[in-house]
């Protein structure tokens, strides 16, 4: 009987600790994948990894030097044609 009570109390304490930890996070893990794609895009921009007109672009792909990626064809467009 005592062992059962100890196990129940331990389970309740662990559950409470998990809930407290989840509340303390303050949503820092929300949209983690989205943030990582944005970081990757920014990293590629700053390191000069950009594509010329006609190159494939989009999420997790090459960033366009012109800054214009056609969302339908997933290709870089020239500033004058955008």
Swiss-Prot record:
Cys-71 is a key residue that tethers to the channel by covalent attachment, leading to nearly irreversible inhibition (k(off) very low). In order to determine the solution structure without dimerization, this residue was mutated to Cys. Residues 23-47 form a propeptide. Its main location: secreted. Changing residue 60 to A: Small decrease in affinity to Nav1.2/SCN2A. The keyword Signal applies. The modification 6'-bromotryptophan is found at residue 49. A protein binds at residue 71. This is Mu-conotoxin GVIIJ. It comes from Conus geographus.
């Amino acid at each position: 009987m005592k062992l059962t009570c100890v196990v129940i109390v331990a389970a309740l304490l662990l559950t409470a600790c998990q809930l407290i930890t989840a509340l303390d996070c303050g949503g820092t893990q929300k949209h983690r994948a989205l943030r990582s794609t944005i970081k990757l895009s920014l990293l590629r921009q700053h390191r000069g990894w950009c594509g010329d007109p006609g190159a494939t672009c989009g999420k997790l792909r090459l960033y366009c030097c012109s800054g214009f990626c056609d969302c339908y064809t997933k290709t870089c467009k020239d500033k004058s044609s955008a």
